[in-house]
Amino acid sequence: MKTSLQIAAEATPRPITQIAEELAIAEQFVEPYGRYRAKINLDLLDASHDRPRGKQILVTAMTPTPLGEGKTATTIGLGMALSRLGKRAICTLRQSSLGPVFGIKGGGSGGGYSQVIPLEDSLMHLTGDIHAVTQAHNQIAAMTDNSWYQKNRLGIDPEQIQIRRVLDVNDRFLRSITIGQGGSQHGIPRQTGFDITAASELMAILALVSGENHADVMRDLRQRIGRMVVAFTRQGQPITADDIQAAGAATVIMRNAIHPTLMQTIENTPVLMHGGPFANIAHGNASVVADQVGLRIADYVVTEAGFAMDMGGEKFFDIKCRAFDAKPAVVVLVATIRALKAHSGRWNIKPGRDLPTDLLQENPDAVYAGGANLQKHIRNAQLFGLPVVVALNSFPDDHPSEIEAVREIAMSAGAFDVAVSKVFSQGGVGGEELAEKVLAAIDQAGQAQFLYELEQPLTAKIATIATKIYGAAEVSYSEAASEQLAKLEANGFGNLPICMAKTHLSISHDPALKGAPTGYSFPIREVRASIGAGFIYPIAGDMMTMPGLSANPAAQQIDIDEHGNTVGLF
């Protein structure tokens, strides 16, 4: 089979103005960035206020291997399959961070015959939103340090400056640094570090702002940025971006980033790409405004939640769905036979290495042995009150006995149905079985619900997630984490939802624990607050907010030829 880049290069994208026209988006709301991408101005929300709302389909997954299990390709393929069945469908996806693109995991634009095109545009910069977030965030960070340096009228405690600088890169050398060296005219030395932009609170804000019209969204953006807690005083009082008078400038930098970007799939199904928060160190979903626009202009919005149901899936309901008045009608859970075998504990799949040859051999017993992971994710999804359709992402090495094992595992856990998805190799036609079963599930959909109430104490909400979703027996806190929780409660932030930062390679905090571990203690080592975004995020285990590069990063294979064509990109 051809590479994803070769397939993308042979595809024929249509002018983005035509894609917009077919969605009945008036020309005045389409702001092209070249021929094949365009910002959709949020004035469209005002103009489409009376349109009936579409239905939302949430795509998530079982716990992935480091290679990923094809969730984005499934999301795109399902959108294309719905279009083939005569439905007006649109996909909403996050914008890819350059960190994973040049790292090991790859981008978030799908692959094979189920991808967003033009591929390079979708992976490299798009319309500049991530750069706007980076600039705005670092502007606030610079003004925080400057406020402390310039007479410190707000009483900033330098040991409690919360905001760290960000870059859209994987770079472990920036995790812990000293700034302000070289004498007093260059600042005052202090320890800090960088996070990846996808972990920035401003990225989470961009993905969570909402409103009934353009003005509402802009107002919400300005207010959320103003509420960002950048530091504390020695007395424990929060200091915000408004306090240091940085919120206005940051909002101006991001004023164009609030508009979602319209792209298309390889079969010309429309895609809205907007927002890029990671799901392991942020809430991991495409923006609320992309969904709002999609629900106004399409009958079905297929959206993706990052990593697995315990990660982006849970956060989709308990964080994103609280930000606007819409909930999905069905959950699609992506599974692969290789991931099920990996969760048997018999193989150790590592990024950058070929799959063990014996893992590809027919072995339904290994599939059953890893089935607890898939079943746990199905039951987790059911906690939110919706039917679950399992999409088995098919690979050439899958065997009929293994496929039947997946069906038995899923149905015994209460899945609505199981569909074999071949969208990677066949495009939309390979997703028609999945689309038909999703539509059948929507006809019987229940009412989506939250996992916990916001009024519960922070520790109770954390315990609910850890025990009900992760299978832990208890939660343990470091001394620092306990103090941080107490300070947040004392400052009136106890009614915010929880955004757990943990590994995506296990339902637990420990990437070595496969399957569906139970009976363990879930450790919280640190608790941070994203008050502007509107959540508290505890950090479990050794979770890093700035990734590092592997020994053989993907960037080493990427180059350009004499005609300006990208080579080596997937």
Swiss-Prot record:
**What is any one GO biological process for this UniProt entry?**
tetrahydrofolate interconversion
Q: Which UniProt keywords apply?
A: ATP-binding, Ligase, Nucleotide-binding, One-carbon metabolism
Q: What stretch or stretches form a coiled coil here? A: none
> Which InterPro entries does this UniProt record tie to the protein?
Formate_THF_ligase (IPR000559), Formate_THF_ligase_CS (IPR020628), P-loop_NTPase (IPR027417)
Query: Any idea of its EC number?
Result: 6.3.4.3
Q: What catalytic activity is recorded? A: (6S)-5,6,7,8-tetrahydrofolate + formate + ATP = (6R)-10-formyltetrahydrofolate + ADP + phosphate
Task: List ligand-binding residues for ATP.
Answer: T65, P66, L67, G68, E69, G70, K71, T72
The GO terms describing molecular function are:
ATP binding; formate-tetrahydrofolate ligase activity
Its pathway is: One-carbon metabolism; tetrahydrofolate interconversion
| Family in the record | Belongs to the formate--tetrahydrofolate ligase family.
UniProt protein name: Formate--tetrahydrofolate ligase
Instruction: Report the source organism.
Output: Herpetosiphon aurantiacus (strain ATCC 23779 / DSM 785 / 114-95)
**Which gene codes for it?**
fhs
